[in-house]
Each structure stands twice: as structure tokens, then as C-alpha cells.
């Protein structure tokens, strides 16, 4: 598999189900996504693309977002208050960046080349063995 960190990047658009929240993320056409096994990601079917803050732009819907935090309170889970979809959030692993739900990107924006599994159910132990590069 080729190194995706060197691939050219363009702005990809996405959003929530109702369209009230729209964003764009700077990413290559082919990505590696992460599936986390923690309770909130598993129940939501969330598929992560974690990027540094400068590679994320909220286009519309800031006033439609509601935020949920639990456990340490570090992660800020942002949900559309109209349709309930979490299309992005500030992850505990990268509080200076964003995790975009790949499933909320507009169709045809990216191709998922690989899905890496992250044992979020055992977050602390998993973080000692895995480095999340962005």
C-alpha cells in the first residue's frame, strides 16, 4: 500500500443528514479510516478520519450544534440539534484536531483504502500501543 500521508490533498465536503451542519476537510482522495470499538463510536457507526484543526472548516450550522461530553470530558461530541447526527467532533486522542465521520462525507469524496481497528473499549491501554498520526 502506498503512503497516503504524501498524497495530494483537496477540500472534501460533508455534513449531517438534514443538511443544517456542513463542513469541509482537507484530505487525500484515498484515505485510511479508523473504526473505534468504544461505546459511543460503536453505537453510532462512526468511522474516523482524524485531521489537525487547520484541515477542518465548519461551513454552516454552528448554531445548530449541541455538544455532549462524558468520562474525562476531553472529547467534545458535536451533534446536529435538528437530525441528531454527529458528523465531526474533537477527539480525546487529538484535542487540537477534529475527527470527521467518513460516512458523513458527500458521496464520492474519498475512497477508503483501509479501515484500521482501534480498541476504544480499552482506550487507555490501546493508546499506549498505538500512535494516531495526522
Task: Go through each PLM region and give its residues.
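A short Gly-Trp-Pro
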Residues: 1-134
